[in-house]
Each structure stands twice: as C-alpha cells, then as structure tokens.
C-alpha cells in the first residue's frame, strides 16, 4: 500500500512561501481601518478630523512660529470667500443669470434690450462732402481739413498773397552823404587788382580732346609737358646782368637732374652771364 500522507506533505513543501512578495489577507476583515491621510498639508486631507485630536475651531495649534506669513494664512484657511461669487437673491428656486459685479459697470442693473442704444456709425470728416453755406455759417465756422493736405488755397490766391507781402515790405531810402568827396567807395564791392590771382593757360591743352591711354602709360604726357616748359622758358625775356647774382658754392655742388631738360637749358643760358659777372668781394662763409 502506498503512503498518501507522505506525498501530500511533500507536495505542500515543494513550493517556497511568497510572504516576502505580497501581503494578501486570507479573509477581508469587516472592521474599519484608519487609512493614512491623502495629504500632509493641514486642511487638504479629511477635514472632519483634525490632527492630534484637536477640533476645527482650534486651528491655532497648527500654526508655528517658524512659519511665514503666507503659510500662516494658508493654514488658517486663507481669506474667507476669496474665490466665491454671490449672486443677488436667494439660491433656492430657478437658476438666475450671472450678474456683473458693481465695480465692472457704472450701474448695478444691466440695461435691457429696449434700453440699449444702437451705436451710430459715423464717417470721417474728410470723406464727407459738404457744400459751404454762408447763410448758416457763424463766426466759429472752421472748414474741414483733409487727412494729409492742409493747404486749401489755390495757386492764384497764393500768388496774390505773395505780391501783397512784397508790397507791404518797408524799403528805406538810401543814405546820401553831404560830403561825397571825402567818402571813399567801400572795398567790399570791388576787389583790389593785387588780390586777384590769374594763372596763364597751359599751352597745348585741349579740354575736349580724349585721353590717349597708350601715351599716358608710356609717359608721353610727361615728356610733352617738360618740352612745353622748356619752350616757355626760352620765350621768356632775359633779365639784365645787374639782377643776376653769382652762383653760390652750394648750388655748384648740387648735381643736375637728368630728367629735367629745362634745368640744363637754364644752366646753359645762365653760364655766360655768370662768367661775365665780376667775382664777389668776399667769399661766403662755409656752412658747418
């Protein structure tokens, strides 16, 4: 015969207990169990019971000295009826419409549909044409001005007003002196002859002639200008011998410029004059 008691005992001990994984009561108890509060903030959990056995009237025990003013006000319930709106009349009966507060409108009772005025639609003044009627005009009449152009006069009216202004200008007579011989003409009207500078025109220059770039790149205009300067120096009248001074030793030491042909011609022309001039009485002192 088989021992059934041993098999049942072995089957029951084959699985490990699951007490560490979950707690499942064998039978639902009918006794009421106190659940933890939904929130730790006083007043947000079950308001029927106060913490530490105090009643709702003794909420001063919740406020601590270390709390801020905002926390103290929140623990005491805040301002009464802060977010409530009380409609006029009784709350019992048919529901009433939402009434506007007194501070939002000027009168306590809103106007009915018959009392409401229809807003008048008006057009801007510059879009309305109204003929001027002198019979209805008063002293305070002002013509309507446009949105941009404020000049209501015609060109003929403007010209007539300008002519009247010119005529109204006071013109003083010229002051005539009793002694015209002693009074000289002012220098402001006529400039003296010495103050005006006049430059001779450059010979051979044509303002209308186009620029030759090949001549410009090859320094052709430079050579032409140097030749014109040499020709103008040759045509200039020669100064007398008395006005020509002997060359200084510094001028003799300076080398001649090979690019300036006008300097060579001037040196050639001044050489016979300088040789004919008598030698100076005293030699100049050499510069240190």
Swiss-Prot record:
Q: Which PANTHER family match?
A: CHROMOSOME 7 OPEN READING FRAME 57, SI:DKEY-276J7.1
> What's the source species for this entry?
Bos taurus (Bovine)
Locate the compositionally biased regions of type Basic and acidic residues: 221-236
Please give the residue ranges the record annotates as the region Disordered. Answer: 31-52, 179-288
* Polar residues: bias regions: 206-217
What protein name is recorded for this chain?
Uncharacterized protein C7orf57 homolog
Q: Where is the composition biased (Low complexity)?
A: 237-249, 267-276
């Amino acid at each position: 015969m088989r021992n059934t008691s041993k098999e049942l005992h072995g089957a029951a001990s084959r699985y490990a207990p699951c007490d560490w994984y979950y707690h499942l009561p064998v039978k639902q108890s009918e006794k009421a169990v106190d659940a933890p509060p939904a929130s730790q903030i006083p007043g947000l959990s079950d308001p029927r019971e106060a913490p530490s056995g105090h009643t709702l009237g003794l909420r001063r025990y919740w406020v601590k000295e270390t709390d801020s003013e905002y926390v103290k006000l929140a623990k005491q319930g805040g301002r009464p009826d802060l977010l409530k709106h009380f409609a006029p009349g009784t709350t019992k009966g048919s529901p009433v419409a939402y009434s506007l507060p007194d501070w939002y409108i000027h009168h306590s009772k809103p106007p009915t549909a018959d009392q409401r005025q229809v807003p008048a639609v008006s057009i801007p003044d510059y879009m309305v044409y109204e003929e001027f009627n002198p019979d209805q005009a008063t002293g305070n009449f002002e013509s309507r001005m446009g949105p941009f152009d404020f000049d209501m006069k015609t060109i003929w009216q403007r010209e007539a007003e300008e002519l009247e202004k010119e005529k109204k200008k006071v013109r003083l007579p010229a002051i005539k002196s009793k002694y015209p011989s002693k009074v000289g003409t002012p220098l402001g009207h006529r400039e003296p002859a010495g103050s005006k500078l006049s430059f001779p025109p450059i010979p051979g220059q044509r303002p209308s002639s186009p620029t030759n770039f090949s001549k410009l790149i090859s320094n052709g205009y430079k050579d032409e200008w140097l030749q014109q300067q040499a020709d103008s120096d040759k045509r200039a009248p020669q100064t007398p011998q008395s006005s020509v001074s002997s060359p200084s030793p510094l001028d003799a030491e300076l080398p001649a410029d090979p690019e300036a042909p006008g300097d060579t011609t001037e040196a050639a022309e001044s050489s016979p004059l300088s040789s004919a001039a008598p030698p100076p009485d005293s030699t100049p002192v050499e510069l240190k």
